[in-house]
């Protein structure tokens, strides 16, 4: 596939740059660019997240002894522009362990549209906020029983 992969957790950087042909972004996707956030990298690295979101879901106990460090940020809109993404994008997967709403709330939906979005929710209260946001931009939730922790949204033609 062709695409952009954003991953601020340092433990993944070497392998991603060595093994993926996609564009790799080491900055943390966030609601704004050029900020600095504390990132919490944990023993189960797929549960690493922006430290402010370390306690928001049922995985909080795995994040209690993480290694924290500062990361620079880039907004999703700026990330797409930096890499010359088309205005119509086939697929967006957003799995940031808690900050999904913050990121999507600040996305320029007038500039970028997606045929399919999968968005992790982990059954937190953020799930309904994401639903309101995405349906407000014309997306429809589908396949609610397909994935346990992710919602699938499509944008009808």
Show which residues each predicted segment covers.
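Phosphate/nucleotide-binding beta-alpha loop and adjacent structural elements of enzyme active sites
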Residues: 1-157
């Amino acid at each position: 596939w062709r695409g952009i992969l954003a991953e601020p957790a340092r433990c993944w950087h070497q392998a991603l740059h060595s093994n993926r042909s996609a564009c790799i972004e080491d900055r943390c996707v966030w609601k704004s660019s050029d900020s600095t956030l504390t990132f919490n990298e944990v023993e189960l690295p797929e549960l690493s997240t922006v430290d402010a979101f370390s306690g928001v879901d049922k995985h909080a106990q795995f994040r209690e002894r993480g290694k924290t460090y500062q990361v620079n940020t880039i907004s999703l809109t700026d990330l797409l522009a930096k890499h010359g993404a088309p205005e119509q994008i086939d697929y967006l997967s957003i799995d940031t362990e808690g900050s999904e709403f913050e990121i999507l709330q600040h996305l320029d939906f007038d500039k970028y549209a997606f045929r399919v979005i999968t968005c992790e929710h982990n059954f937190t209260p953020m799930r309904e906020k994401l639903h309101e946001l995405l349906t407000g931009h014309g997306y429809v939730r589908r396949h609610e029983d397909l994935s346990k922790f992710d919602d699938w949204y499509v944008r009808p033609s």
